[in-house]
Amino acid sequence: MWTLLVSLAAGALVSVGLRTTGAIHSTGAAVLPGVLVAAVAMVLLFRRVAGRIGPVIEEAQRHLQGGRRELAMASLRGGLELGRWHPLLEGSLRAQIGALLYDQQDYDGAAVELRRAAKRPWESRAFLACCYFRQRDDDGMAKAFEQAVKVGEKEDLAWTMYAWCLNAQGKKDAALQVLARGLEKNPGNQRLRGSVEALKEGKKIKVAPYGDRWARFGLDGSIATGGMKIPKAMRGFAQRPGFRQRPTKKR
């Protein structure tokens, strides 16, 4: 991560310079200015990277809205070169690339990207789990879903997807256990409760209430009405993290 290294180097140079030139006679006292310089340098570098990656994400979104999938993918891959400058950037971009490959039913390629992707938001791990589900990798699916529900424990859809896949594998009891865990984290959740009752009665898990959020994963062959797009929670870096955007001046 070049941002951290450059920032620390700048801070160290300031501290050493102040100490060796005699501007500050105490080594301990020379540390504080170096720390401040390192912090300022890191903030400025992060802002610079965020300012460069924001347009990349927005360009990818425009390509997707225009149905230009390959161009959207190229835009996101082009942003990977900035990953060395921000600790979270590469994982975020790979999550988005993986989601697009999943949409194209390239589950092998999607899994490769998603394994290197950030674990947050929970959708990143859920996409990976769905890849494993389609590849009939039961252990990989369970591991990825466990990560998904750990991150998104308050998201009833995460628990529902996990249970749906287990039930589809003929593991009804395991699916009920997952839904029960989901209810422990979300007491009184009517969607999870309804799915438990449906399974106990030998019916299908209820997924219709989730609409496009469920259809986005295409597990039951459903198609999102909004077409192909990166889930909002997975986009990231469309705006500078931690900083407000300057308002556009009206002419």
For the regions a language model picked out, list residue spans one by one.
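Helical anchoring/docking segments at protein termini
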Residues: 1-52, 223-251
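N-terminal topogenic membrane-targeting module
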Residues: 24-31, 35-108, 112-115
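Alpha-helical linker/edge segments of TPR/alpha-solenoid repeat scaffolds
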Residues: 51, 68-70, 98-109, 135-144, ...
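N-terminal alpha-helical segment
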Residues: 53-56, 72, 125, 141, ...
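Alpha-helical adaptor scaffolds
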Residues: 83-164
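Long, non-transmembrane cytosolic or organellar matrix-exposed soluble domains/tails
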Residues: 171-251
